[in-house]
């Protein structure tokens, strides 16, 4: 296990900057997921930790030792790639033990560690097979076994599940998590898949355009996104966002001519300002003729475990989770009630979160009081 410290790390390709002064610290034994869209710099950062990319400026330290000038083999890291990169002419056992063979580990010791590692990842019965005779999930296990056998201080995962089908991704997520609990090694996992991020991470790093947008526990980030980017990137469907002006007298914001109530403290703090308001689809309350903002149904997604209605409000699409008892179809008029306690506020100019007396836990507690009256 090793702590990783990233200090003001920048990366440029010629005159094109890719990473803009990244500052991060990962605790020893922590499982960190770096999440972001394609091109955000997450894989570049991982490759810089591994030593596969040069650092333009800044420092990376592993276990208290600055590794900027160290070769990849000297950093104590093992990497698992999206592409398994197995030797097709070698058996599973030979693939797993190849690094030990190159390092000159005696044959008996090498065989013992191959068998122990194969047992950890459930490949004991496949050691004599070639990669072509394995499923995608089994090949990924070989790739992980090849990393485990080196007994590294740090595991680096670069989108290792992207080539697997949906069912295999679920089972491999569980295997990776159990593996981490067993080995307790510091692990950094890069992905663009928010489900992988939410289910695997002890701590989540959200990146966008070479910058770190937010760092925290996955649920903290989900419930308190630091920006409109995080709010729209985390969650499926994404958070509903609309920009409007705060009315003090009501107190409310107006959406398509309909007031959406605010707590008085919120209205006073934000009075007269344009704000971007957000609410998660599962926190909208949908009815056919109840209170709320009128909307026209565009389409309904049947997910088996639930249903999502997508509706038009003044030319903007809003999403809301609905139960099986509410039957709606395209073209129908519905009403979306947006509970005060679940509203989020952002600065339209910067996209950054605005904290007020009427948001988050304070708002929820006040809402419970209002409902009790």
UniProtKB/Swiss-Prot annotation:
<keyword id="KW-0067">ATP-binding</keyword>
<dbReference type="Pfam" id="PF00005">
    <property type="entry name" value="ABC_tran"/>
</dbReference>
<dbReference type="InterPro" id="IPR008995">
    <property type="entry name" value="Mo/tungstate-bd_C_term_dom"/>
</dbReference>
<dbReference type="InterPro" id="IPR015855">
    <property type="entry name" value="ABC_transpr_MalK-like"/>
</dbReference>
<feature type="domain" description="ABC transporter">
    <location>
        <begin position="4"/>
        <end position="234"/>
    </location>
</feature>
<dbReference type="Pfam" id="PF17912">
    <property type="entry name" value="OB_MalK"/>
</dbReference>
<dbReference type="InterPro" id="IPR012340">
    <property type="entry name" value="NA-bd_OB-fold"/>
</dbReference>
<comment type="similarity">
    <text>Belongs to the ABC transporter superfamily. sn-glycerol-3-phosphate importer (TC 3.A.1.1.3) family.</text>
</comment>
<dbReference type="GO" id="GO:0055052">
    <property type="term" value="C:ATP-binding cassette (ABC) transporter complex, substrate-binding subunit-containing"/>
</dbReference>
<keyword id="KW-0472">Membrane</keyword>
<keyword id="KW-0997">Cell inner membrane</keyword>
<dbReference type="InterPro" id="IPR017871">
    <property type="entry name" value="ABC_transporter-like_CS"/>
</dbReference>
<keyword id="KW-0813">Transport</keyword>
<protein>
    <recommendedName>
        <fullName>sn-glycerol-3-phosphate import ATP-binding protein UgpC 2</fullName>
        <ecNumber>7.6.2.10</ecNumber>
    </recommendedName>
</protein>
<dbReference type="InterPro" id="IPR027417">
    <property type="entry name" value="P-loop_NTPase"/>
</dbReference>
<keyword id="KW-1278">Translocase</keyword>
<dbReference type="InterPro" id="IPR003439">
    <property type="entry name" value="ABC_transporter-like_ATP-bd"/>
</dbReference>
<dbReference type="GO" id="GO:0008643">
    <property type="term" value="P:carbohydrate transport"/>
</dbReference>
<comment type="subunit">
    <text>The complex is composed of two ATP-binding proteins (UgpC), two transmembrane proteins (UgpA and UgpE) and a solute-binding protein (UgpB).</text>
</comment>
<dbReference type="InterPro" id="IPR003593">
    <property type="entry name" value="AAA+_ATPase"/>
</dbReference>
<keyword id="KW-0762">Sugar transport</keyword>
<dbReference type="GO" id="GO:0015430">
    <property type="term" value="F:ABC-type glycerol-3-phosphate transporter activity"/>
</dbReference>
<dbReference type="InterPro" id="IPR040582">
    <property type="entry name" value="OB_MalK-like"/>
</dbReference>
<feature type="binding site">
    <location>
        <begin position="36"/>
        <end position="43"/>
    </location>
    <ligand>
        <name>ATP</name>
    </ligand>
</feature>
<keyword id="KW-1003">Cell membrane</keyword>
<dbReference type="GO" id="GO:0016887">
    <property type="term" value="F:ATP hydrolysis activity"/>
</dbReference>
<dbReference type="GO" id="GO:0005524">
    <property type="term" value="F:ATP binding"/>
</dbReference>
<keyword id="KW-0547">Nucleotide-binding</keyword>
<comment type="function">
    <text>Part of the ABC transporter complex UgpBAEC involved in sn-glycerol-3-phosphate (G3P) import. Responsible for energy coupling to the transport system.</text>
</comment>
<dbReference type="InterPro" id="IPR047641">
    <property type="entry name" value="ABC_transpr_MalK/UgpC-like"/>
</dbReference>
